[in-house]
Design a protein with these regions (language model features):
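H-loop (His-switch) and adjacent beta-strand-loop-beta switch element
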Residues: 157-170
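Helical segment within the ABC ATPase nucleotide-binding domain
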Residues: 123-136
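Conserved ABC transporter NBD signature motif
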Residues: 5-13, 22
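Conserved ABC ATPase "signature" region
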Residues: 46, 61-79, 104
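ABC ATPase nucleotide-binding domains
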Residues: 183-219
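Catalytic Walker B motif of ABC-type/P-loop ATPase nucleotide-binding domains
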Residues: 108-112
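Conserved ABC ATPase signature
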Residues: 83-87, 91
Length: 219
């Protein structure tokens, strides 16, 4: 629950909405994979339609069409009848995204969504989100520790320092060597991506501040 402040979407205070109404505004892809292991992939993604089912909980053709589209977008169609408990961590992460897409909201919140994905599925995942921001005018907010992915895919970034927003702006303006060295307390180099020109963050591996001593291991 909200502890302080207010969150407004299109002039509406989200805290004043019933949870079902709020679920039609924003969907969440959590870091923890909280999926029923005995459910099939299809059943798990169908849960995203809950805010639209009414008191009887009956699904219709539209609901199943949206679920099938979400499965296709996340490359899960071939796994639709598999039990979630049989999937790898990366596959379960894609199920969470498919469930959120099936919720069909204008806002999508994601917490470290690429943690359990290999390089191919990271690219598929983030490219899909980029496409949806254009095709559906979707607003996507992502928490990422991978600064290179943030620099490559984000339109705007917010850099945190000690739990508060330190800087916001375009990746090239925020993800600079000076800013990152201060926030992370370690020297870094930032170079342009060879094809896209976006910032690539490289730790300064030869810096003495990066050396691990026996005293560090004892502390």
């Amino acid at each position: 629950p909200l502890q302080k402040g207010k969150i407004w979407v299109d002039g509406i205070d989200l805290a004043r909405l019933h949870p079902i109404q709020r679920a039609r505004y924003l969907a969440v892809v959590p870091q923890a994979r909280n999926l029923p292991s005995s459910f099939s992939v299809y059943q798990s993604v169908l849960l995203g339609r809950t805010p639209y089912l009414g008191w009887l909980g009956r699904t219709g053709k539209t609901d199943h069409h949206i679920v099938e589209r979400a499965l296709e977008q996340t490359r899960l169609t071939s796994l639709a009848q598999r039990r979630v408990g049989e999937l790898s961590g990366g596959e379960q992460q894609r199920v969470l995204l498919a469930r959120a897409l099936a919720q069909d909201t204008p806002i999508l919140l994601l917490d470290e969504p690429t943690t359990h994905l290999d390089l191919e599925h990271q690219a598929v995942f983030l490219n899909l989100l980029r496409e949806l921001t254009v095709q559906k005018n979707l607003t996507v907010l992502i928490v990422l520790h991978d600064l290179n992915l943030a620099g490559l895919y984000a339109d705007q970034v917010a850099l945190l320092l000690k739990g508060s927003v330190h800087l916001t702006g375009k990746p090239a303006d925020v993800l600079t060597a000076q800013n990152l060295s201060r926030v992370y307390n370690v020297p870094v180099n930032v170079v342009p991506h060879p094809e896209y020109g976006t910032p690539l963050v490289l730790p300064d591996g030869k810096s003495k501040r990066n050396e691990i001593t026996t005293q560090d291991l004892k502390s």
